[in-house]
Swiss-Prot record:
Its EC number is 6.2.1.4, 6.2.1.5. It catalyses: succinate + ATP + CoA = succinyl-CoA + ADP + phosphate; GTP + succinate + CoA = succinyl-CoA + GDP + phosphate. This is Succinate--CoA ligase [ADP/GDP-forming] subunit alpha, mitochondrial. The gene is sucl-1. Keywords: Ligase, Mitochondrion, Nucleotide-binding, Transit peptide, Tricarboxylic acid cycle.
Amino acid sequence: MLSQQIANNARTLQKGAARFYNSTYNNLKINKDTKVIVQGFTGKQGTFHGKQMLEYNTKVVGGVNANKAGTEHLGLPVFKNVSEARNKTGADASVIYVPASAAGSAIEEAMDAEIPLVVCITEGIPQHDMVRVKSRLLKQNKTRLVGPNCPGIISADQCKIGIMPGHIHKRGCIGIVSRSGTLTYEAVHQTTQVGFGQTLCVGIGGDPFNGTNFIDCLNVFLEDPETKGIILIGEIGGSAEEEAAAYLKEHNSGANRKPVVSFIAGVTAPPGRRMGHAGAIISGGKGTAADKINALREAGVVVTDSPAKLGTSMATAFLGKI
């Protein structure tokens, strides 16, 4: 009951302020010059994934840990707070690897410093914290949030901000957006295998209150001349996929239409049972896989019945355009 009340309050907040925040979707366009700082830099996760980001040649320029300010970690400076880190490094993005109890405050600290792109990997952030964050987020137009509870965002062969395996990515022409982390990797691997590669891959996360949705990413993909096709991976719960379908119906048509392939997880999920992600639940008869699949197909999207068919379905969709 409390979760439903929180959800209703968040939706009310969204409607009035969303347009102001929506202008920040361009902050998703990361590249080889994007400067990244790490919040929770010296912790176990921050260290491990910070190393991997550096190995991918991401421009990590420092990190934040108030208790170790003034020292170095992984050969990079550690700052007292995000504001100091941004002032001294000119950071364009921040990635957050801090425990759930402190993650909401970490996002707000990055917002206070007006970091253009904030990627929060942390899972299990209390919903009440995220409602507070979302309320603040929608009232400003400087910071774009990806996540929480997500694998991050990657511009293939240029910049990796998150926990995704870099080696499966290859520069190419497919834009990928997904609520599921592991299914994102499946789509990436398949598009690499069939020779398409990727432009930008965004894991938007599986929580009910996230900073970036399907439509934000579709905006980027449809405007980007390098992106020739789109893969959208959804799951049960909420109405994000139906809203994305309506957006595609209106904005992706005619001679310049880009092929879109989708997979929806949770076809056999029983109503009322949460399936992994906090937002993956059929509630009140809404958010079923069937509703989402029908809406997407009506918008001209090719919906596969298995994630193993994403690559071949995209190849077939391209052949249909020739």
